[in-house]
Amino acid sequence: MGFVKVLKTKAYFKRFQTKYRRRREGLTDYYARKRLIIQDKDKYNTPKYRLVARATNTRIIAQIVYATLKCDRVLCAADSYELKRFGVSTGLASYAAAYATGLLLARRLLKQIGLDTVYAGQTKVDGAYFNVDEDQKEKKPFKAILDAGLVRTTTGNRVFGVLKGACDGGINIPHSESRFPGYVRASDEGESSKYKPEDHKARIFGKHIDAYMKHLKGQSNEAFQKQFSKWSKTLEAAKVDSVEKLFTKVHAEIRKNPERVKSTKKNDKPKRDHKKFYPTKLTAAQRKDRVKTKFQLALSQ
């Protein structure tokens, strides 16, 4: 059979249905969203909470969101930019920063709803699978579902770093270790799949950054300064000699005080005097008097 060119006819364009704007722009996966937010029909005003994790080129954003008929509402949020006050001023889009952001979100949320003392989470980070047990306390743990958006959920993605941090922080999120760094899938030779928690722990504490810093410093000091000058300044400011010790310190500080600090920036610009530009509204009596005055002035002329 020869090649047949597909012609888009008038009927094709007449029946063509465009996708939703946010799907066309690559912002919302409505197929997944429908399954994430729809609740059982016998439950009323009981929203499903989503852990929305997004990674950009420069930062990690984590939010706890629930849907209403009108819009989505954010219950709690954390940003990797907030790690600057804990001593991390660079590498804010790394896997280690993603874990710390998830931990910050979890501790902040639980403190907000009064469950921070009930559910401490995994205080000793070892990279092993951990999820809050629903039956171990009187109060049920806060439950959320991971919303990864349109990102490819490959093994080791930073989205799962946020997930691991939130789980270790005390939020109950259904998951498995099959997408964490350190998970090896079953091979065709007959080897079964296995999970290495120590590899995941190394990523959480940024040991891979330490290893490459050491390697590059031994190769070329010029290349090291070009690649890791900001990291050197960060470690020097935090008074530690490795990225692992830095994030160990950060995790402890987050658990101590996860609350958001208000900005202390002062607005140097003076407030605009709007009364100067907009005249005050006259009352009915004042308007009548003004008309009378204008009428008498016209008669006198």
Swiss-Prot record:
Residues 257-271 have a biased composition (Basic and acidic residues). It comes from the Eukaryota. One of its GO terms (biological process) is translation. InterPro entries: Rbsml_uL18_euk, Ribosomal_uL18_C_euk. It is found in: Cytoplasm; Nucleus. GO terms for molecular function: 5S rRNA binding; structural constituent of ribosome. Component of the large ribosomal subunit (LSU). Belongs to the universal ribosomal protein uL18 family. This is Large ribosomal subunit protein uL18. It comes from Tetrahymena thermophila (strain SB210). The gene is RPL5.
